[in-house]
Every structure is written in structure tokens, then in C-alpha cells.
């Protein structure tokens, strides 16, 4: 592949397996070692002199472990733990020290309780500051990257320009998209990973670390990470639009439900009011009916007593009549 321009320069790719010659090449297309360090690493690589499982101190789950580099030599285990615990629960932490002097070697390993916590630190802690030094964070390549050769044997990744032994393909220094034709056959003979023509990543994308096989969520996450920033933005807008649509429908449904419940309560209240009014009316009729009966009965009783009184007075002689009768009786005597 050939190309040019800024668009090509800004396109990168990352190594998924380690090869010393490729690691020494800025675009991953070298077919011969260009410095003594690469030659030494190639010798170890071909002879199988490095065994990543031979480090007795490399314990723990590699899928939950991060490499932390470029630490200050004054940074302690406590300081490293305090900073890295912001991203999750730390299960184990090891600051690598010189076997004789005990001085810090400037790097360490942090194991988290879960892969999710490790990923959070992998994404957020990279290029953060600890004791005034900008650190680098990467996955545990020692145990997870096929063919890995460490820095002390001429391999590794990254490095500083002043050292004269830069290594490419890692998170800090990815391979650039080649500006020259790719020697496909030569690379295949050496067993070197070919550049992913047409599938380069941008520098703003974060390369995904190795994940356990068989996880659907891992495949989805890798697919998402490999998308361009434009595709991710479009997908984000689409998901946001769908969430907004469903939220609007849910809100409308909730509002409609509230209105129906409110209407039902109003109708129920009206029914209860009508029922209450009828009950009160019947109660008042009953009470007034009883009072009317009592009043009517009282009136009838009074009229009956008056009638009886008149009848008695009618049958009894009057006082004047009695006196006349008495006088007449005495006169006759």
C-alpha cells in the first residue's frame, strides 16, 4: 500500500502479537533489525529463551492486571495504591524493585478485582500524574501478548527518543500507516503481522486489550472500539434519538394513564356525591316524616280531648240551671 498526506499520518494500528523486527519499525514493515537491541531480542525470540510464565512473582489474573510505567523512583506502594484505587478495588499490587538495592525500577503491576475495574483504569489512568510524573498504563503484555520479549532483552514497547531504542506497536507509540509499498511476502516469511489495510484506527481511539474468549459483551465492545469516531458519533445520536423517542412515549403513556385515573376518580367522586345526596334526602324524608306523624298525632289527640270535653259539658246541667232547680224544689216544700 502506498499513500501520503496528513490523513495517512494520523492513521495507526497496533500489534496484537510481538515480533522484535516489527517492533523496531515505525510503520511495522521492516524486514531486518536496525539496532543491536532488536538483534538481541530477535535471538531470544527465535531461540525461545524467554518464558513469560517463568516469573514466579507474576501472580494473579492477567486479564485483571495492568502494567503501570514511567513512575518516579520516589513513588511508593502506598502512593501507587492510593492513586490507582480511584478506578476500582485493588486485589494485588507489586512495585518492581532492584533485587540488590531495593530501589524502585519505575514500573509496577496492579491487579483489580474484576475486568471491568481494570478496563476503567486502562482507559482513564493513562497519562495521568503521580508524584509529578506522567505515567503510562497498558495491559499485562508479559502474560497476554504472544511472542513477548521484555525491554531488558532488547524488546519491549515504547521508550524515549534519547535512548535510541524506540519500540512501536504499543499504546504509547502505535505503528503509523505505511507511506511505502508493503513487502507482503517478506513479512509473511518472517511471521510478522501485516498492516490492516483499509482498517486503520485514528489516534483518538483507544486500542482494546485482550479479553477472555467466548464473551459476547467482549466482542461487542471490540467491535465498538474499532469503529471510526464518526460512526460512533452517528451511533450515539441514533441511540440518543431512540432513547428520546421511548422516553417521550413513556411520558405520554404515563400522562395518559394519569388522565384516565384522574377521570375515573372524578366519575367515582360524582357517583359517590349523587349517592350521598340520595342517602341524605332519604334520611331527611324519614326524619321529617316522623315529625309530621308526631305533630299530626298530637293535633288529633288534642281535637279528641276537646270533643270529649264538649260532650261532657253538653250532658251536664249548667250551674244556673242547678240553682234554679234547687230553689224550685225548696219552694215546693
Curated annotation (Swiss-Prot):
The keyword Cytoplasm does not apply. GO terms for biological process: mRNA processing; RNA splicing. Residues 245-262, 310-324 have a biased composition (Basic residues). GO terms for molecular function: RNA binding. CDD domains: RRM_snRNP35 (cd12237). Ubiquitous. The keyword Oxidoreductase does not apply. It comes from the Eukaryota. Phosphorylated. It is found in: Nucleus speckle. Residues 64-142 form the RRM domain. Residues 154-333 are annotated as: Disordered. Residues 159-175, 215-241, 263-293 have a biased composition (Basic and acidic residues). InterPro entries: Nucleotide-bd_a/b_plait_sf, RBD_domain_sf, RRM_dom, snRNP35_RRM, U1_U11-U12_snRNP_70-35kDa. May facilitate 5' splice site recognition in the minor spliceosome. May be involved in interactions with components of the major spliceosome bound to the pyrimidine tract of an upstream U2-type intron. Part of the U11 snRNP, a component of the minor U12-type spliceosome. U11 and U12 snRNPs exist not only as monoparticles but also as a preformed U11/U12 di-snRNP complex. Interacts with CYP95, SCL28, SCL30, SCL30A, SCL33, SC35, SR30, SR34, RS31, RS40, RSZ21 and RS2Z33. This is U11/U12 small nuclear ribonucleoprotein 35 kDa protein.
Amino acid at each position: 500500500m502506498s499513500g501520503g498526506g496528513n490523513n495517512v499520518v494520523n492513521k495507526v494500528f497496533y500489534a496484537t502479537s510481538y515480533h522484535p523486527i516489527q517492533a523496531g519499525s515505525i510503520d511495522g514493515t521492516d524486514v531486518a533489525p536496525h539496532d543491536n537491541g532488536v538483534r538481541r531480542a530477535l535471538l531470544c525470540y527465535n531461540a525461545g529463551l524467554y518464558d513469560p510464565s517463568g516469573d514466579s512473582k507474576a501472580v494473579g489474573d492477567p486479564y485483571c492486571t495492568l502494567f503501570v510505567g514511567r513512575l518516579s523512583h520516589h513513588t511508593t506502594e502506598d502512593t501507587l495504591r492510593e492513586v490507582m484505587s480511584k478506578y476500582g478495588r485493588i486485589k494485588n499490587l507489586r512495585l518492581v524493585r532492584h533485587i540488590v538495592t531495593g530501589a524502585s525500577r519505575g514500573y509496577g503491576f496492579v491487579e483489580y478485582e474484576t475486568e471491568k475495574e481494570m478496563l476503567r483504569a486502562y482507559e482513564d489512568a493513562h497519562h495521568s500524574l503521580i508524584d509529578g510524573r506522567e505515567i503510562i498504563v497498558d495491559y499485562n503484555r508479559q502474560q497476554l501478548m504472544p511472542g513477548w520479549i521484555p525491554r531488558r532483552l532488547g524488546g519491549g514497547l515504547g521508550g524515549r527518543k534519547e535512548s535510541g531504542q524506540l519500540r512501536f506497536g504499543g499504546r504509547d507509540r502505535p505503528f503509523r500507516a505505511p507511506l511505502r509499498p508493503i513487502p507482503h511476502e517478506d513479512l509473511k516469511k518472517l511471521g510478522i503481522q501485516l498492516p490492516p489495510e483499509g482498517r486503520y484506527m485514528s489516534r483518538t481511539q483507544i486500542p482494546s486489550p485482550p479479553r477472555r474468549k467466548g464473551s459476547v459483551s467482549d466482542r461487542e465492545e471490540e467491535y465498538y472500539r474499532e469503529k471510526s469516531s464518526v460512526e460512533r458519533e452517528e451511533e450515539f445520536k441514533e441511540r440518543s434519538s431512540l432513547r428520546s423517542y421511548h422516553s417521550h412515549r413513556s411520558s405520554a403513556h404515563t400522562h395518559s394513564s394519569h388522565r384516565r385515573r384522574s377521570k375515573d376518580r372524578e366519575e367515582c367522586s360524582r357517583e359517590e356525591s349523587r349517592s350521598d345526596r340520595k342517602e341524605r334526602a332519604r334520611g331527611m324524608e324519614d326524619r321529617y316524616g316522623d315529625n309530621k306523624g308526631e305533630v299530626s298525632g298530637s293535633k288529633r289527640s288534642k281535637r279528641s280531648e276537646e270533643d270529649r270535653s264538649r260532650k261532657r259539658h253538653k250532658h251536664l246541667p249548667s250551674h244556673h240551671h242547678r240553682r234554679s232547680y234547687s230553689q224550685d224544689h225548696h219552694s215546693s216544700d
